[in-house]
Structure formats: structure tokens, C-alpha cells
Amino acid sequence: MRIGIVGAGLGGLLAGALLSKNHEVVVFEKLPFLGGRFTNLKYEGFQLTTGALHMIPHGNDGYLAQALRKAGANVKIINSKPDGTFLINGKEYLYKELFSLLGFKEKAKAFKLATKLKLGKVDKNISFGEFLEEIDLALKVGNAFTGWALSLTAYETPMSEIIEIAKNYHKFGGPGIPIGGCKAVTDELSRIIKKNNGKIIKEYEVKRIEIDEKAYIDDYEFDVVISNISPIETQKICNIKFLKSKPKPSKGIKISIATKEGIIKHGGVLFTPECERINGLNQVTNVDKSLAPEGWHLVMTHQTQLTNNVKKEIDLGLEDIENLFKGKDYKILHIQSYRDDWPVNHASNGTDIDNIVNDRFYLVGDGAKGRGGIEVEGIAMGVLKVVNYINSL
């Protein structure tokens, strides 16, 4: 089949790499670079990113890693050990150690909640915040997790998504860091597409998608079209109206920091439940020193954008950083706000659009993630669903 793909972000490139083995693939990208919000930005010798945090939520074992191997991508992913720690009263705790901070009654409640979640025996129609709200520390920890992983508060996160996330965590484990950062992944996918005689056309803005007896991207004719741009933007340029409900984008702010001393000892996430805004941070140079100049560390913080006053949100994040570093020398490299047409996710978890519109038209990307898929894992889940469906036609 001849397959046209709109958008060369992670979803479009992953779909293209997997499908180009047996099909003729053409990828259209309006920007002068590939990877969308999953590639590197070189700045003062540091490998910053256009969006992601140089981390894959389920490391070398999750859906993205499996899809990369299926595509034949040569990407090395180092699993984080530990997955993460939680900073409470100036001290780091592993998840299981958090229970020691609770009184007897709260500890009993917490164990009960943790067991219910692991077994999936909870009310799926409530929010994660409602599930946790009887225990103050649990709610703070929950907000830190959903803020870092989903760019949502615990109250904005459906319990149905948390149940699926928990299943995936118990199945695959925690995060990992791709050596070379995000760009190592997207560069490898573009290499595979070209090796399989696929085409990638950069700086080309698609004006129209037409689905009829054949599928069209402007004047190009295809058997199948896959859109990796936002579902809302896709519908605007398409003759098919497929959105039954409007997806809700998630907003966030990332701050990249240079430091010689470092702030984290491990390659996982440091969750910050007591911060005013920052939900967590990582120090990827503990695993891959090539992401910073010699003698330096790259630290990246992430926070959910809680209000529409972006300047205030950034200022609160900077205050958190000052408190976290406690007199250590550091330098702010870059502040990035993800909202409007360049959000964290085009559809927040729980509002994703189905991948399959019809036999000629499909959606991938962070507006069409699989259930319980954190960021790029959700993208990979959606891509695998589309690829399997197309290959079964």
C-alpha cells in the first residue's frame, strides 16, 4: 500500500518506520527539523529538548522500546535505578518508605488504598485526587506524580487512567534514558524510513486531507493516510468530521538547568510533593554524560501549568528551584512553556481520540494515546494499534 503520514513527530516517524518495511511511505513535516517535541536542541554544549525530558516512562521494557525493536531501531535505553525518589522535609524516600511517614491510622488507610489500586478494585468514575484526598501526604505525592507524568493535577486525572497506568507499571517497571537523548530515537526512525525507500518531505505544510475511495494529502494520492498532528487541527483540514468530543490539551512548563555539583544521585525522577509548582526533576547526565559539556550536569524540572498567568507560574517554578538547590551554584539554561498549539499533550489522559477513523484514515500522536499510556508510551500504544490494523487489511 501507499501510505501518507502528516507530521514527523515521534508518532509519525514510528508509524513510518514500522510500515515502511512492507509499504510505500511518504511523511510530510511543516517544520525544518524532524521529531516534533521529541528531539534535541543544542545550546551551549548541552543537549536540551524540544519537549520531552530525555526519558521513556517504561524504559527498555515498555511499549515504545518494544516498537523500536520491532522497527529495527538501534537505540540503547538504560533503565533507571531506582525509578524515582520523593523529597519530603529535605530527605529523599523511596515509594515504599513513604508509609513510614504516616501515623498508624493513616498508614492503614494508605496500605488499603495501595492494595486496592494494585488489584484494580477501585471506583473508576472518580478522580485520582478523590481517591487520595483522605491522606494529605498521599494527595501531595499523587499530584507530584500526575504533574510530572501527565501534566495534570490528581483531581484532573481520571481513576480509570490511573488503574491502567498502574497495570503498565507493574508489567514493565519505571523509566529509562535513551543514550543520546530524544534525538537518538527520532534520528534512528528517520534513518529506517529512508533505508526502506520511504520519503520524508520537510518544510511542507499540508493544506488538505481528503478521504474518499482513495485518500489524499493535497494532490498526493494514497491508499491510507495517518495524521500525527493534533486531532483538532486534523479535523480542520479534513473532509471527514470525526471528533465526537473535543480533546482537552495538557499544559506544562519545563526549566533546564546547568549545574556542576548536581542535585540528584540517581538516574530516575526526583518527585517534589512539597514544592509550590515543580512536580519533579531529573538529572539525565548521571546516565549519559554526552548530554552536557564535560564537568557539567543537565537537570530538567517539570510542572503542570495551573493558571493562565504563565509569568507567575514560571516565577513560582524558579522560586522552587532556588529552594531545591539550597545555595548550590546553578544556571538557568532554558524555560519552555507548553500550551495552545504546542502543548504537552494535544489530548490529556482520559480525553484521547480513537486511532481508527476508518479503513483509509488513522490518527497517531499524543492526541490519540492508548489507555494508561504515559506520554510517549501512549503514543507507541496508538501507533502499534494502527500498524497492526493496517497490516491486517
UniProtKB/Swiss-Prot annotation:
SUPFAM superfamilies attached to this UniProt entry: FAD/NAD(P)-binding domain (SSF51905)
Family annotation (InterPro entries): FAD/NAD-bd_sf
Cleavable signal peptide: none
Record's protein name: Uncharacterized protein MJ1488
Organism, scientific name: Methanocaldococcus jannaschii (strain ATCC 43067 / DSM 2661 / JAL-1 / JCM 10045 / NBRC 100440)
